[in-house]
Amino acid sequence: MLDSKLLRTQLQDVADRLASRGFTLDVARIESLEAQRKVVQTRTEQLQAERNARSKSIGQAKQRGEDIAPLMADVERMGNELSEGKVELDGIQAELDALVLSIPNLPHESVPVGADEEGNVEVRRWGTPTAFDFEVKDHVALGEKFGWLDFETAAKLSGARFALLRGPIARLHRALAQFMINLHINEHGYEETYTPYLVQAPALQGTGQLPKFEEDLFKITREGEADLYLIPTAEVSLTNIVSGEILDAKQLPLKFVAHTPCFRSEAGASGRDTRGMIRQHQFDKVEMVQIVAPEDSMAALESLTGNAERVLQLLELPYRTLALCTGDMGFSAVKTYDLEVWIPSQDKYREISSCSNCGDFQARRMQARWRNPETGKPELVHTLNGSGLAVGRTLVAVLENYQQADGSIRVPEVLKPYMGGLEVIG
């Protein structure tokens, strides 16, 4: 969340910057609540001081042999008024807190200004899409030909937007995840992490999914215990490792990577990508998270994005890198790069990774800090996250880009060790 001091001292400037994201900040409501808070707080503090003075005078009156009943009545009345004032103050603060939690992050000055995805800026391209000399098939046709990609059975088990993978395609899916994890551990310096797939609400609030995006989550309600949510991304569990912690400067940067299933209701995706594996309720992803000192976060974003790009390069999949504009960035990000991989059957690039610097936005929500050796004081860390990569979409890209005229699939060179040396499937 944003710094409350910034909202008090530079509210209009914050509103102007948020407008570039298409977000309208309710300045009047915040100003009104802040004014109410100040009035009630001042009144409460004055009442507390007066009550303390009256309480002290009771002892003095007692020593003089005076009737203390009126003073006792005053103290009791003031105590009741203080209790009422606290309830009122808590109510105002709760509304302010809810408003602040609904405000997205401020975009970095280097982010291109735009209203939607049309305003995104292509930064670079890598690779050249293959010019096939036959009619390309999509991944659904390729997978169903041999019975290795089974949406009908998945629908029988779980409904729409699920997939059942079998045989060589299931093995290829596993190979991709193992290859990605090994690359990030061995070449990029990440620590492999196994995390819970179910988290409590504070973890999701810490990374920004709650309270604003609850409809996108799968929730498990338990009688007598805290509700649990299936993770929409390992970003939630990985980033929250440092929730409530004060890290030593020597611990930074922290670099975590995890391969997990992800669960999303896709509440806003009705009618989009209904065929195949592009948009699923359950999908696997290899997620990278970095926890860094504030001055290092922009350089870390470039490095993290490069880590994700390296996966695509080694798989020899054509892709492009986009700098997202202000109107297309995620809620918690100050700056985001999207990687889009070439999908031959659609004749276009599709998102396969999103890499974001969240600045101190998530850290403030989580109270994740480090001790600055120059000041000796705890300060907020900066957090970054990125897909390295979405495994299902990478599988789609491999199936389509490595297809042959007879419907068989060549195995990418870097995956052959994970596939027992298999050269072709199908």
Swiss-Prot record:
It is found in: Cytoplasm. Its main location: cytoplasm. L-serine binds at residues 233-235, 287, 387. SUPFAM superfamilies: Class II aaRS and biotin synthetases (SSF55681), tRNA-binding arm (SSF46589). One of its GO terms (cellular component) is cytoplasm. Its EC number is 6.1.1.11. It comes from the Bacteria. It catalyses: tRNA(Ser) + L-serine + ATP = L-seryl-tRNA(Ser) + AMP + diphosphate + H(+); tRNA(Sec) + L-serine + ATP = L-seryl-tRNA(Sec) + AMP + diphosphate + H(+). InterPro entries: aa-tRNA-synt_IIb, aa-tRNA-synth_II, aa-tRNA-synth_II/BPL/LPL, Ser-tRNA-ligase_type_1, Ser-tRNA-synth_1_N, SerRS_1_N_sf, SerRS_core, tRNA-bd_arm. One of its GO terms (molecular function) is ATP binding. ATP binds at residues 264-266, 351-354. Keywords: Aminoacyl-tRNA synthetase, ATP-binding, Cytoplasm, Ligase, Nucleotide-binding, Protein biosynthesis. Pathway: Aminoacyl-tRNA biosynthesis; selenocysteinyl-tRNA(Sec) biosynthesis; L-seryl-tRNA(Sec) from L-serine and tRNA(Sec): step 1/1. GO terms for biological process: selenocysteine biosynthetic process; seryl-tRNA aminoacylation. Consists of two distinct domains, a catalytic core and a N-terminal extension that is involved in tRNA binding. Catalyzes the attachment of serine to tRNA(Ser). Is also able to aminoacylate tRNA(Sec) with serine, to form the misacylated tRNA L-seryl-tRNA(Sec), which will be further converted into selenocysteinyl-tRNA(Sec). Homodimer. The tRNA molecule binds across the dimer. Belongs to the class-II aminoacyl-tRNA synthetase family. Type-1 seryl-tRNA synthetase subfamily. This is Serine--tRNA ligase. It comes from Pseudomonas savastanoi pv. phaseolicola (strain 1448A / Race 6). The gene is serS.
